[in-house]
Amino acid sequence: MGQKVHPYGFRLGYNKNWQSRWFSKKDYANFIYEDYKIRSYIKKLLYSAGISKMEIERAGGKICLMLSTARPGIVIGRKGVEIEKLRLELRKNFGQEFSLEVTEVRRPEVDAQLVAENIAMQLERRVAFRRAMKRTVSMARKFGAEGIKITCSGRLAGAEIARTEWYRDGRVPLQTLRADIDYGFAEAHTTYGIIGVKVWIYKGEVLDKEVEK
């Protein structure tokens, strides 16, 4: 049975960039683990802000953290109070200096990670999974997605046996390298167990082969 490669790993250096950008020889494993802990900590702390992407750069003992969010106001706060509080919390927890940059996601309806989290939130509120998928697909197509595919896996609608249901509209060419495929994953914690939600959104072709900025 064929398995699907991660759309980002498949396109790294072609039309997708690395989300951790640093170089190390002896501290490589420590940095990888620290990046994972930083991402997990921020995701848990700012889940309501709709964090789409976290990019990490390291230089001169300082960590530069770039956050893409649907609600920058929640992250920054009034007069930058919240972002300064976050910087101090990160320094206290990880023992390093942080600089933070926040960019707004203009169209969250076609951002795969935010779409996946939105579906997971609906499933936790007991919305029927088919209705949640169809509503999300039509919204993404309305906002300019050329194709979208959603899969939900787990004990759907409280069924005894776990299964996978999927819904697709438009084209989603996963094997075409020049295709700009956005991918997101989220988990819905329901009374029956965890339901995994995966989203692929096709946004057109990248013709000039430049790595995304």
From Swiss-Prot:
Keyword Ribonucleoprotein: yes
UniProt GO cellular component terms: cytosolic small ribosomal subunit
GO biological process: translation
Domain KH type-2 residues, every copy: 38-106
Molecular function GO labels: mRNA binding; rRNA binding; structural constituent of ribosome
Listed Pfam families: KH_2 (PF07650), Ribosomal_S3_C (PF00189)
Keywords carried by this UniProt record: Ribonucleoprotein, Ribosomal protein, RNA-binding, rRNA-binding
Gene3D superfamilies hit by this protein: 3.30.300.20, Ribosomal protein S3, C-terminal domain (3.30.1140.32)
Family to which this protein belongs: Belongs to the universal ribosomal protein uS3 family.
Subunit structure: Part of the 30S ribosomal subunit. Forms a tight complex with proteins S10 and S14.
PANTHER family: 30S/40S RIBOSOMAL PROTEIN S3, SMALL RIBOSOMAL SUBUNIT PROTEIN US3C
Function according to Swiss-Prot or TrEMBL: Binds the lower part of the 30S subunit head. Binds mRNA in the 70S ribosome, positioning it for translation.
Protein name: Small ribosomal subunit protein uS3
Organism: Lawsonia intracellularis (strain PHE/MN1-00)
Gene of this entry: rpsC
